């Protein structure tokens, strides 16, 4: 059983590489544009493959249109990949938008903004302390 899992994982990895090449080099559909294949999850019986993809687009409507274009071309993409892989049965492809990359970038930007805001507040607070200390030093010197 463990051997079955490793075989499906190896097939998924090879399928991911082949899909990335096919989508980059062989697909001429302008609706799809630049697509990145993040992961491929193959069923145990190799009949289905979930292909997780991302795009540079953030607009949900455009992303949905691109996923629909990929789904419409799934049979053609499947035939191109089947010619490159030596499998008895080529899995049926299902394209799924993977928003984890976009969410990760959004979270990274939020963290960076909070850090820069915090540094600005600390600097401002430090400048205020310097001003109050220098005024205290001047008042002590007058006595």
Swiss-Prot record:
Any GO molecular function = ribosomal small subunit binding
Coarsely, its chief localization is cytoplasm
Its GO biological process annotations read: maturation of SSU-rRNA
Q: Which domain of life is it from?
A: Bacteria
Cell compartments where the protein resides: Cytoplasm
Please indicate if the UniProt record lists Cytoplasm as a keyword: yes
Tell me the segments the record calls region Disordered.
116-143
Q: Where is the composition biased (Basic and acidic residues)?
A: 116-128
In terms of InterPro entries, this protein maps to: KH_dom-like_a/b, RbfA, RbfA_dom_sf, Ribosome-bd_factorA_CS
State a GO cellular component annotated for this protein.
Answer: cytosol
Keywords in UniProt for this one? Answer: Cytoplasm, Ribosome biogenesis
Output the SUPFAM superfamilies linked to this UniProt entry.
Ribosome-binding factor A, RbfA (SSF89919)
Q: According to its UniProt record, which protein family does this protein belong to?
A: Belongs to the RbfA family.
The record's function comment reads: One of several proteins that assist in the late maturation steps of the functional core of the 30S ribosomal subunit. Associates with free 30S ribosomal subunits (but not with 30S subunits that are part of 70S ribosomes or polysomes). Required for efficient processing of 16S rRNA. May interact with the 5'-terminal helix region of 16S rRNA.
Q: How does it assemble?
A: Monomer. Binds 30S ribosomal subunits, but not 50S ribosomal subunits or 70S ribosomes.
Put simply, this protein is called Ribosome-binding factor A
Annotated organism of origin = Shewanella sediminis (strain HAW-EB3)
Q: What is the lineage of its organism?
A: Bacteria, Pseudomonadati, Pseudomonadota, Gammaproteobacteria, Alteromonadales
């Amino acid at each position: 059983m463990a051997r079955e899992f490793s075989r499906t994982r190896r097939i998924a990895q090879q399928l991911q590489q082949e899909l990335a090449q096919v989508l980059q080099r062989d697909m001429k559909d302008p609706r799809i544009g630049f697509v990145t294949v993040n992961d491929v999850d193959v069923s145990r019986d190799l009949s289905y493959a979930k292909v997780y993809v991302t795009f540079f687009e953030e607009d949900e409507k455009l992303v949905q249109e691109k996923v629909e274009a990929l789904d419409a071309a799934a049979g053609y993409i499947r035939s191109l990949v089947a010619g490159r892989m030596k499998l008895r049965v080529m899995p049926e492809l299902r394209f799924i938008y993977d928003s984890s990359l976009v969410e990760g970038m959004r979270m990274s930007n939020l963290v960076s903004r909070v850090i820069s805001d915090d540094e600005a507040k600390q600097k401002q607070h430090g400048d205020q302390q310097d001003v109050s200390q220098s005024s205290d030093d001047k008042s002590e010197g007058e006595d």
